[in-house]
Amino acid sequence: MQLCGFNVGLDQRFFLIAGTCSIEGLEMSLDVAGQLKEACAPLGIPLIYKGSFDKANRSSGTSKRGVGLDAGLKILDEVRRQLQLPILTDVHDTSHVAEVASVVDVLQTPAFLCRQTDFIRAVAQSGKPVNIKKGQFLAPWDMKNVIDKARAAAREVGLSEDRFLACERGVSFGYNNLVADMTSLAEMRNSGAPVVFDVTHSVQKPGGLGAVSGGARDMVPVLARAGVAVGVAGLFMETHPKPAEAWSDGPNAVPLKHMRALLETLVALDDVTKKNGFLENNFGA
């Protein structure tokens, strides 16, 4: 699969979707995107910068939601222009799809909306690549139905069916808790779409701090190493210079100063995993 000018697949180095959870202004976005670019470039990691203009799914009605659609798209467009990076953001409503797709390079769907047929059809018919997140309630093999739905919608309007990513972001395991099942990353390959592992949301504790979500930030490197060892096409990780001050999802964000060291480890693992191939593909023979 071609994505933003680079090849994606299990025979390629993983690509990275990274940025702050919520867009926190132009200066912050340029700083984070610039540091991520500097970390990824020497390691040969293709980078897609992400930022959310609206955090529609919040634990509390008083939680900060973001800079809004118009300001957010302007900031993302400026990041792309100044740093020459492809841009991703999430959409939450069919009414926003066309406007957002006119600015960003990749759309992303919230996990909770993965079964909403009209919504999936709208993003699939936008003409842009789409990172489709698996719901926390969904079995990994059911993502094939979601991807097939998106492909059928694209086919109806004469668009390429080879534009969709299947993203794992953890599964609900009791109250206020998510776990990451590593077998899901392999199971989701059967969707026919490249698999992305959203590491930072997989360590989230939804609503775990009462009015806000908690998270186990120290487990991000652990799950990232495990996911890369399984073999994935891409990784998704949110980061922040000062996670404790982040507008959203600070408890599960990677401290920006540690991102380069983490990526160096992950590249080494990725090289070993993909060089040796995937023995599991032969176990059914």
Curated annotation (Swiss-Prot):
Family according to the record: Belongs to the KdsA family.
HAMAP family: KDO8P_synth
Protein name (record): 2-dehydro-3-deoxyphosphooctonate aldolase
Catalytic activity: D-arabinose 5-phosphate + phosphoenolpyruvate + H2O = 3-deoxy-alpha-D-manno-2-octulosonate-8-phosphate + phosphate
SUPFAM superfamilies to which the protein is assigned, alphabetical: Aldolase (SSF51569)
Location relative to the cell: Cytoplasm
A Gene Ontology biological process term: keto-3-deoxy-D-manno-octulosonic acid biosynthetic process
Name of the gene: kdsA
Enzyme class: transferase
Organism classification: Bacteria, Pseudomonadati, Pseudomonadota, Betaproteobacteria, Burkholderiales
Keywords, in A-Z order: Cytoplasm, Lipopolysaccharide biosynthesis, Transferase
